[in-house]
Amino acid sequence: MSEKRITEENRYAGLALAEEELVARVAWCYYHDGLTQNDIGERLGLPRLKISRLLEKGRQSGVIRVQINSRYEGCLALESELQQRFGLKIARVLPALNTPPMNTRLGIGAAQSLMGILQPGQLLAVGFGEATMSCLQHLSGFIGSQQVRLVTLSGGVGPYMTGIGQLDAACSVSIIPAPLRVSSAEVAEILRRESSVRDVMLAATAADAAVVGIGAIDQRRDATILRSGYISEGEQLMYARKGAVGDILGYFLQADGRPVEGLEIHRELLGVTLDELAQLPTIVGVAGGEQKAQAIHAALIGKRINGLVTEETTARAVLALAS
């Protein structure tokens, strides 16, 4: 051991300095001077493990406070709060910006989040909605290169085409060959027994991950399920009077996250049920806009999703509802 190192070791390891000063000195070297923990250990005559523990003690005691000067700083804090509050596996909060359009930004964020969890050859189940279709558009290259397979969670071909239509022809895509909603519960039951419908729905219940949109009653005429013609404005008003705040896959939820009881539409839908969806390991909800806050909150407290991609203003509104 060099004479310099012996001198340093006697000085610091012998605790000639108060621990607070030692923490401060280690922090300065690490954050200000950009030294590695090994470099600091060499300089102060301390093992790397001791340096690591001093840095952690500094963070816990408040001696070290890291400030991130970025528009993403608030988003990162909100992600952490959402994960802790609702026990989420994934939380992604995007900055509140005017451009590009929100659904485009949400789609990009959801695509990036899914790229981090999907393994080659796995099966991704997809719900309808503008944000989820934007997600597929931005996942197209990844889906092709990693041979990720796709399956729809609900009937209805039209609402899926803006996303699926962007994929390479070689991509494996299974679509439920039936409408999202049919004229009666009896017709729905007959179609569910058809092997072509049943097999795709069974595949969807075995997916490795799912991405779904969250609709809101407060969207009024902007709601995808209304614009697609699956419900009428009169039905939308009736659902609201019965306590509905939003929907996932056409199933309408109350503020507490439970399905609204007694709605005929729930028996007329063709697709994976909410209970079946809940069995999947990862269910990422993609939604933004303050008018969707209550619907997102319902999905979270009802454990309908365990991942969320949203934007900053919406995240704050959701957390306000939870407080």
Curated annotation (Swiss-Prot):
Transmembrane segments: none annotated. Inactivated by phosphorylated autoinducer-2 (phospho-AI-2). Phospho-AI-2 acts by binding to LsrR, which is then unable to bind to the promoter regions, allowing the transcription of the target genes. Keywords: Cytoplasm, DNA-binding, Repressor, Transcription, Transcription regulation. Pfam families: Sugar-bind. InterPro entries: NagB/RpiA_transferase-like, SorC_transcr_regulators, Sugar-bd_dom_put, WH-like_DNA-bd_sf. It is found in: Cytoplasm. Residues 37-60 bind DNA. Its main location: cytoplasm. Belongs to the SorC transcriptional regulatory family. Transcriptional regulator that represses the expression of the lsr operon in the absence of the quorum-sensing signaling molecule autoinducer 2 (AI-2). It also represses the expression of the lsrRK operon. Acts by binding to the intergenic region between the lsr operon and lsrR. In the presence of phosphorylated autoinducer-2 (phospho-AI-2), LsrR is inactivated, leading to the transcription of the genes. This is Transcriptional regulator LsrR. It comes from Klebsiella pneumoniae subsp. pneumoniae (strain ATCC 700721 / MGH 78578). The lineage of its organism: Bacteria, Pseudomonadati, Pseudomonadota, Gammaproteobacteria, Enterobacterales.
